[in-house]
């Protein structure tokens, strides 16, 4: 009997979250923090056997678990991971550890509830990446909204209620069509098994409707232009930990949905809609990058840069050649970009949080000369700013570079437009860094700053290691996903239109 590692990865953080919640009284804040940290670390350790035991040479689902759950509607508790999803599970658990540490001294009210929300959210997000049953996917996908809604709405900034409500409404409205699509697929195939849906022939009109239904749910989550407007508000109002999880993991749920649903279930519609998807992705990459350039609020700037970086991901998914094959290099680059963005965006939001905790302002104008008072912090901040701009040898470069290489094979002009983002990305990242960190000390707030403490340096150090290792040695990441990416590309290249009698 093999260990149910995936079930443990999902339910251990949720159970620790419930345990933390039971320590809800304020005199037990210290204990609640330690229980939450223990839960987050144990949850991360559970994901290590998944990586070590994963066989990258096959595209088959691994660590499979299947139990009857709701036999009346043929839904089962079915889990499994392949090369497309395996890395997101340790990434989620790793970011959760950092988030619990990030709120250690900063969050003073409702400490147990705050940490519990993140632990439960972590388990739910790991659930999204590891279920192979459509009904269960919908439940996990929607359930992630609730802890995030609470995190933004309770511990957020002055406009937190508006931001939380907008976030909830946007993402929920998008997902309603997905529920109809899932119900239709269950009705047509008689099962909720996602793998069976992948092989089920569908007429072109049906595929287009299904593609559109899934697009509404996933595009809002990514978020793609023009349904991205909830994201800057949510980021600006969210506490530091909330922004870290939102950017690092929650945006990936939508991109992952394209890989697991839109492309394999509706391949012919994916080809038909590819020009539209490429256009929307390029608008996100270029236009939203330019929007980031004029932001005065650091969190807004990084939020817009997140949308631009996720534009690279959707671009990499939808570049098909004449034979209908998606580009292997671009597809791998897009998935690497998802993982890298998890580290880099979490680091950027944490850096802004470190300064905000001291000065209580996110405005770029409130800073200047931070390097004089916080030299260690400024060094880490520089590394992450460079990674955000896509500097070679950082993780931010690998995915973007592969997508651009893939795009050159597909269409030179698309590659050229996509490559401009490296210039725009460097512009807004370095322009922000220059104004915040360099120059003379701007005011007495900056003069009184203290450098990052041990806890903050530990978080920055762990993220720096992740960004550099992935940037210099991406092979373990590409090796595990190779077989699964090729399998997906071959699957999407075959038409699923029913044969005419």
Q: Can you describe what each PLM-predicted range is?
A:
Residues 98-105, 123-135, 148-432:
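Hydrophobic transmembrane alpha-helices and their helix-loop junctions in integral membrane proteins
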Residues 374-376, 430-501:
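Cytoplasmic/organellar membrane-interface segments at the starts of transmembrane helices
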Residues 38-53, 171-180, 387, 423, ...:
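Hydrophobic alpha-helical membrane-insertion segments
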Residues 8-23, 37-50, 91-103, 121-123, ...:
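Central hydrophobic cores of alpha-helical transmembrane segments in multi-pass inner-membrane proteins
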Residues 101-117, 240, 248, 445-455:
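Cytoplasmic juxtamembrane regions at transmembrane-helix boundaries
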Residues 1-5, 19-116, 191-199, 487:
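Transmembrane helix-loop-helix hairpins at membrane boundaries of multipass inner-membrane proteins
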């Amino acid at each position: 009997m093999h260990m149910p590692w995936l079930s443990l990865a999902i339910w251990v953080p949720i159970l620790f979250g419930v345990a933390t919640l039971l320590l809800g009284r304020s005199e037990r804040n210290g204990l609640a923090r330690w229980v939450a940290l223990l839960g987050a670390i144990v949850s991360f350790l559970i994901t290590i056997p998944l990586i070590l035991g994963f066989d990258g040479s096959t595209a088959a689902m691994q660590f499979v678990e299947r139990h009857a759950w709701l036999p009346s509607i043929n839904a089962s508790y079915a889990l499994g991971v392949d090369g497309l999803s395996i890395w997101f599970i340790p990434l989620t658990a790793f970011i959760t550890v950092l988030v619990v540490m990030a709120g250690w001294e900063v969050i003073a009210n409702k400490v147990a509830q705050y940490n519990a929300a993140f632990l439960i959210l972590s388990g739910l997000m790991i659930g999204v990446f590891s279920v192979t049953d459509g009904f269960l996917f919908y439940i996990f996908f929607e359930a992630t909204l609730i802890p995030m809604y609470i995190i933004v709405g309770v511990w957020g900034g002055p406009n937190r209620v508006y931001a939380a409500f907008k976030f909830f409404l946007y993402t929920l409205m998008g997902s309603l069509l997905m529920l109809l699509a899932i119900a239709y697929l269950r009705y047509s195939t008689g099962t909720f098994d996602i793998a069976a849906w992948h092989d089920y022939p569908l007429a072109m009109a049906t595929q287009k409707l299904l593609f559109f239904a899934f697009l509404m749910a996933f595009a809002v989550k990514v978020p793609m232009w023009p349904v991205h407007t909830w994201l800057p508000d949510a980021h600006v109002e969210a506490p530091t930990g909330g922004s870290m999880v939102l950017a690092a993991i929650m945006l990936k749920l939508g991109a992952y949905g394209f890989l697991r649903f839109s492309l394999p279930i509706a391949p012919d519609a994916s080809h038909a809609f590819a020009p539209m998807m490429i256009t929307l992705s390029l608008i996100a990459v270029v236009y939203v990058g330019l929007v980031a350039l004029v932001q005065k609020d650091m969190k807004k700037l990084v939020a817009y840069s997140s949308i631009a970086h996720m534009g690279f991901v959707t671009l990499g998914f939808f570049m098909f050649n004449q034979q209908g094959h998606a580009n292997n290099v671009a597809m791998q680059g897009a998935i690497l970009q998802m993982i890298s963005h998890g580290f880099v965006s979490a680091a950027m939001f944490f850096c802004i949080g470190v300064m905000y905790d001291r000065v209580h302002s996110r405005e770029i104008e409130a800073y200047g000369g931070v390097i004089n008072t916080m030299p260690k912090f400024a060094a880490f901040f520089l590394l992450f700013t460079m990674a955000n701009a896509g500097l070679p040898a950082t993780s931010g470069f690998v995915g973007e570079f592969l997508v651009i290489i893939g795009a050159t094979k597909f269409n030179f002009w698309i590659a050229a437009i996509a490559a401009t983002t490296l210039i725009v990305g460097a512009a807004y990242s370095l322009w922000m860094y220059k104004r915040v960190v360099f120059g003379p000390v701007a005011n007495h707030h900056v003069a009184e700053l203290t450098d990052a403490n041990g806890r903050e340096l530990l978080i920055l150090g762990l993220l720096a290691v992740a960004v550099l290792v992935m940037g210099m040695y991406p092979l373990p990441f590409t090796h595990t996903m190779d077989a699964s990416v090729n399998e997906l590309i071959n699957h999407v290249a075959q038409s699923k239109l029913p044969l005419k009698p």
